[in-house]
């Protein structure tokens, strides 16, 4: 195993040389794929088919009476889910142009999920409704650009209306209600999230893990969240969550950039000696040093991850020393005459688990001395009191919260791996929705906030008739969430929509779980404004783009034909890639 690490420098150079040879060889014999081009009505109609098929699969999950979707997987048992974005991500069509339309809807779902953490099904349903009407209008001779202007005008009006009606939430009961709704009516999950937020604060770090029992549990551990993610996606260990998860890792903290490949080899050898994963936090990891880490991760299956240090200047240095205190590490700093050439195991930090995403890193249960952590917290508190700068105070308070606040871990239990996976999807949605509700407030749920906002569009003035049609497209689309929720509950959606629009109480809605018309706020059926707003804005944006599309270019699939120049010798005499066969990975 040591030979793998120590030889990696020369292997990296060989790999780059071979890549260059391959590139020059391929450039001289490149094959260009033929393209299929479709125009106008035909192009939009084919994309619409993809949008409709994907939306039909996603919309059945909407609401408390939404149905399950079973997804075949290339490995393991089929996945059972009620999560809209999971369903959307799993769908690919054989027809290339259908797939273009579906891919753009998936972008809407992903964008909504990234910003608000929930509302993907609502965004998909709205996209389908807007694009369908947009296609019909353009086919009837309407000006596509005026339709787009009308759609934007209507969306801006609706967003303003929703913001004026939003109510901020503060109590634990209100937080539990939001979590319950987003978890498809699971009260236990809603209360668990409310308790976690109460424990670590609304800005605190809450993570979700597989439990080891049949029941859901809340555990609060000492931990820290770093606002930086992995330097390279090659460090990912869990493709499903797109995260790097390291159990019981060694933690190296370096104040400067790391570019010395020999120093990196020594660090890897120490981690291998202890048979433990490795987390590196430094200003940056560059060129050959980064290539060394990636090659060992991919070829030798060594669990390793590199993260850029958070902050800038003195603030970065302070953050690194905070992390060192939490994990019991020693910051490698040139000010003390330290470097990686004389590193030993006593300089590494330790913790129970590290989870790294593309945006942040969570360090759980650091092995630092409790007294040292307490003293550092007191030191930061003194600095807060002495500081006269609001900016400095804010940064110091952030550091204090990270050191002293802890991390809430939601351990999700179940009778089987399939059940735990499905519950984790719902808990993730509920947690994201709850954070969104705390951030921007809540509106009546069940789609009624959008439904009643459609009334505001009746009196909206436009520059011309085509823009008016654009406004009407949004007006009709805003009715689809209530319609879909009611239909999934087994009742006539059009009847429910009509009955709600006839009356004037803006909080009255249809409780699909009980089959009753109720005051949605009093019944605890609420939606985060951020989720609804993001879903509508993203849906309108992509639908407008699709409606104004006049041509679609896709590749015509061709059968693979072996090049006569390549022969059977592994790319024309490359000799097993110049010795790479002996890499031993």
UniProtKB/Swiss-Prot annotation:
User: Can you say where in the cell this protein is located?
Assistant: Mitochondrion
One cellular component term (GO) for this entry is: mitochondrion
Q: Which GO MF terms does the UniProt record name?
A: ATP binding; ATP-dependent protein folding chaperone; copper ion binding; RNA binding
Annotated organelle transit peptide span: 1-32
Q: Which is an annotated Pfam family here?
A: Cpn60_TCP1
**What keywords does the record list, in alphabetical order?**
ATP-binding, Chaperone, Mitochondrion, Nucleotide-binding, Stress response, Transit peptide
Q: List the disulfide bonds.
A: none
UniProt key word Zinc: no
Report the superkingdom from the record: Eukaryota
Q: What is its main location?
A: mitochondrion
The record's similarity note reads: Belongs to the chaperonin (HSP60) family.
Supply the name of the protein.
Chaperonin CPN60-like 1, mitochondrial
